[in-house]
């Protein structure tokens, strides 16, 4: 899996395609940590091309959502695919970590 980064000043967008399994969750975590260390104030995780996410992937999203929020910064999921949106809805996290709480929301 290749995560595509778009960086504009201190705003990062990470486009995550395919299935987010344990290995992909580790890769996502490394990319989020790199963004934080680089001074990102906003990190948007674009899941429009993601098909599925495991519990380790959800843990990464929640852990760094909380860390960023505590320091007055932002980490949000944007444009989740229907499958990802359904998983986040079932886990109760959709309204917490998804921008606008809906799939297909553009920044």
Would you name each region that the model predicts?
Residues 1-52, 63-107:
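STAS-like cytosolic regulatory interaction modules
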């Amino acid at each position: 899996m290749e995560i595509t980064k778009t960086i504009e000043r201190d705003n990062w967008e990470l486009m995550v395609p395919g299935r987010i399994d344990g290995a992909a969750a580790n890769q996502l975590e490394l990319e989020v940590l790199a963004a934080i260390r680089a001074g990102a104030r906003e990190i948007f995780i674009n899941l429009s091309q993601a098909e599925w996410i495991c519990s380790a992937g959800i843990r990464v999203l929640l852990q760094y959502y909380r860390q960023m929020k505590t320091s007055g910064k932002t980490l949000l999921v944007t444009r989740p695919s229907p499958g990802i949106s359904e998983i986040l809805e079932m886990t109760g996290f959709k309204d917490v970590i998804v921008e606008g709480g809906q799939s297909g929301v553009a920044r």
